[in-house]
């Protein structure tokens, strides 16, 4: 919802709303949700105070603040029916809004990815729905950090002490954390998409939702204390489920990106039992 004074002179309202529909459909397509839901995918409000002091989720999401009583704001000078706020020009113009929307989508994840994977739907939206090349879409997905292609992100991870010592990525929620608010925290999914196609990622999330709706355990947080039907620990089970969606063993790729199996032997046996083989595509990418 926006003030009438911002939009009464718009001459492109139809194309604007069509682009909003494309962006929201992209979120649903990637994550395996129906395009028509019982609520809007994203409901934004500009004239409700944000009591948190930080950006966040909500229905409505209130991350674009406007105080109608503060006449020093540029919005008052632009109250000519043709305001230039990003959401009135380009629905994908602010990646932060999609980061917060990602939290609201309740997508499954590896525990440490809580502030990382939520950026990934933006990559699909810009690449598939709006035609950006893959690297450009990935670069834009973390807002101002536009110099990180997937390959540059790999270098950004490989130069760390943890990578050189063969350790998992740091997930300490300190200044040393290597997942949150960083491309390298979700680049594994970009690699899966560019190596095996977007369909592999979409198939995974679709199955996650089907399993969740059927009361089969899936990991939606870092405290996965239930047992899995495959008998694996949470990390290993998710690696197996991702591998099934891609049709190949993703363990080496996910290991490269700092998520290590809990029980390598049990995971390898489950991978073999699922009829999944090693991938020369992954091998070639890792030794490239």
Where are each of the predicted segments found?
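Catalytic cores of extracellular degradative/oxidative enzymes
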Residues: 1-194
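Short, solvent-exposed positions on alpha-helices
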Residues: 112, 116, 199-203, 252
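Residues that form generic nucleotide/phosphate-binding pockets
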Residues: 19, 23-26, 30, 207, ...
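Active-site neighborhood of glycoside hydrolase catalytic domains
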Residues: 124-125, 154-245, 249
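Short alpha-helical "patches" and their helix-cap loops
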Residues: 133-145, 199-214, 256
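A short hydrophobic/aromatic micro-motif that marks alpha-helical segments and, especially, helix-coil
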Residues: 129, 212, 262-264
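Amphipathic alpha-helical surface "interface" segments used
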Residues: 44-50, 209-211, 276-278
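Beta/coil-rich, acidic/histidine-enriched accessory regions frequently appended to metallopeptidases
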Residues: 224-288
């Amino acid at each position: 919802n926006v003030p009438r004074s911002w939009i009464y002179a718009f001459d492109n309202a139809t194309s604007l709303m069509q682009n909003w529909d494309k962006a929201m459909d992209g979120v649903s397509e990637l994550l395996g949700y129906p395009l028509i839901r019982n609520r809007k995918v994203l409901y934004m409000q500009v004239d409700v105070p944000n009591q948190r002091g930080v950006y966040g989720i909500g229905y409505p999401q209130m991350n674009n603040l406007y105080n109608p009583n503060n006449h020093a704001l540029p919005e008052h000078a632009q109250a000519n029916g043709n305001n230039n706020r990003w959401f009135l020009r380009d629905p994908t113009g602010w990646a932060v809004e999609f980061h917060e929307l990602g939290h609201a989508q309740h997508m499954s994840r590896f525990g440490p990815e809580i502030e990382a994977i939520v950026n990934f739907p933006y990559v699909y939206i810009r690449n598939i729905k709006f035609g950006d090349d893959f690297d450009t879409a990935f670069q834009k997905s973390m807002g101002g950090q536009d110099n990180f292609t997937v390959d540059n992100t790999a270098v950004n991870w490989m130069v760390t002490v943890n990578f050189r010592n063969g350790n998992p990525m740091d997930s300490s929620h300190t200044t040393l954390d290597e997942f949150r608010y960083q491309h390298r925290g979700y680049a594994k999914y970009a690699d899966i998409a560019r190596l095996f196609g977007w369909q592999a990622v979409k198939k995974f999330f679709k199955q996650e939702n089907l399993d969740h709706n059927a009361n089969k355990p899936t990991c939606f947080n870092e405290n996965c204390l239930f047992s899995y039907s495959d008998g694996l620990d949470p990390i290993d089970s998710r690696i197996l489920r991702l591998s099934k969606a891609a049709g190949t063993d993703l363990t080496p790729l996910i290991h490269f990106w700092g998520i290590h199996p809990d029980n390598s032997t049990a995971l390898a046996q489950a991978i073999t039992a699922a009829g999944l083989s090693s991938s020369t595509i992954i091998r070639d990418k890792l030794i490239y």
